[in-house]
């Protein structure tokens, strides 16, 4: 770098420019990786240098250091990432105490269970973008529920679990009890009401790992899921209800307000001794819901000395323009008091299924 050229720039601009570091290794990439104690991490550090790859590496290294210093991580999961087997990585992070709370859409949460009970019944269609509307209708009529390149086996998953959950809801109504959606689901594991698919690996189920570690799960907007729709139909008492159909009191289910109360207590307790980072996989309500926690504690509960989010890292491909973006970018979050000027932030504009495995591998020391 020509330092004379740099010195002509304004002080603020000079701070933004970094010198190209010396080569990180000697010899070939293959030789370096083969001799490394953590080969995946070694390969990542040698090759993920610029743009989204560089942002992914820097984010992973920051999170690794954050954990080393006693920090904790909240992970949020959007879309249908559980169907796309992100749970393989997330489950291991939970087992290794790298993730301490998960916020997931109702769909992602239930799909983790569906993978557990019906893994061998899933099917794929790699060239899904070439399907015609008529072919989509064929798939519908055959009972094949498509999520981009993946078919969810409804009969072998949803319909297997529904009777068990229905009985739990009915029993709760009789006793006047109410629980969170994830608490009802966890009883499927605890009471051994479901079994893993013979061709599935139970260790790949992040919801099972969260159950074993007893870490909190938050499900904002539970109604926006297959089982949430089913619960809504059981609690509906309007004109469309058929005579003799099962009716359940909706009060057996705790709501998003209850989840927010849970997060209040969790964050205040955990942040006393640990900075907490926010890793957002995709966008939507799974992330927008918990990110509001800190400003709500500050401005609504009037606890102004609450610790800010230590860092915010988002992986997603939705741009902030044209109304398609959900939430706010890292800097914009500062204006809402969701982040401070000292919070680490990084936006990785890429596919979660491509980037998250690298971050997970580095955090796991692979």
Describe the role of every protein-language-model region.
Residues 91-161:
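A generic, well-ordered mixed alpha/beta core segment in the N-terminal half of proteins
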Residues 2-11, 16-24, 54, 275, ...:
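C-terminal functional extensions of proteins
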Residues 59-73, 209-213, 265-275:
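Glycine-rich phosphate/diphosphate-binding loops that line cofactor/substrate pockets in enzymes
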């Amino acid at each position: 770098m020509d330092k004379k050229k740099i010195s002509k720039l304004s002080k603020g601009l000079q701070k933004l420019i970094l010198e190209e570091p010396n080569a990180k290794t000697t010899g070939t990439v293959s030789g370096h990786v083969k001799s490394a104690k953590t080969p995946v991490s070694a390969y990542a550090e040698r090759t993920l240098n610029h743009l989204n790859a560089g942002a992914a590496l820097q984010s992973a290294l920051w999170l690794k250091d954050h954990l080393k210093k006693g920090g904790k991580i909240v992970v949020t999961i959007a879309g249908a990432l559980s169907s796309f087997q992100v749970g393989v990585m997330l489950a291991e992070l939970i087992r290794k105490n790298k993730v301490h709370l998960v916020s997931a859409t109702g769909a992602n949460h239930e799909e983790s269970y569906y993978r557990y009970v019906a893994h061998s019944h899933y099917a794929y269609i790699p060239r899904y973008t070439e399907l015609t509307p008529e072919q989509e209708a064929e798939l519908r009529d055959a009972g094949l529920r498509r999520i981009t390149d993946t078919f969810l086996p409804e009969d072998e998953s949803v319909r297997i679990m529904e009777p068990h959950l229905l009985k739990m809801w009915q029993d709760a109504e009789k006793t006047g009890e109410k629980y969170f959606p994830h608490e009802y689901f966890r009883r499927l594991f605890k009471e051994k009401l479901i079994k893993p698919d013979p061709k599935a690996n139970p260790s790949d189920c992040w919801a099972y790992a969260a159950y074993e570690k007893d870490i909190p799960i938050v499900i904002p907007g539970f109604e926006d899921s297959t089982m949430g729709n089913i619960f809504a139909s059981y609690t509906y008492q309007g004109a469309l209800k058929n005579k003799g159909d099962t009716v359940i009191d909706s009060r057996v289910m705790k709501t998003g307000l209850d989840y927010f109360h849970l997060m209040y207590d969790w964050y205040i307790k955990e942040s006393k001794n640990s900075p907490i980072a926010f890793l957002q996989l995709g966008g939507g309500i799974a992330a927008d819901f918990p990110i509001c926690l800190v400003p709500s504690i500050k401005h609504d509960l009037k606890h102004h000395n609450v610790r800010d989010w230590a860092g915010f890292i988002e992986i997603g491909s939705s741009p902030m323009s044209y109304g398609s973006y959900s939430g706010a970018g890292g800097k914009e979050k500062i204006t809402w008091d969701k982040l401070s000027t000292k919070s680490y932030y990084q936006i990785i504009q890429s596919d979660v299924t491509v980037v998250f495995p690298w971050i997970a591998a580095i955090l796991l020391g692979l």
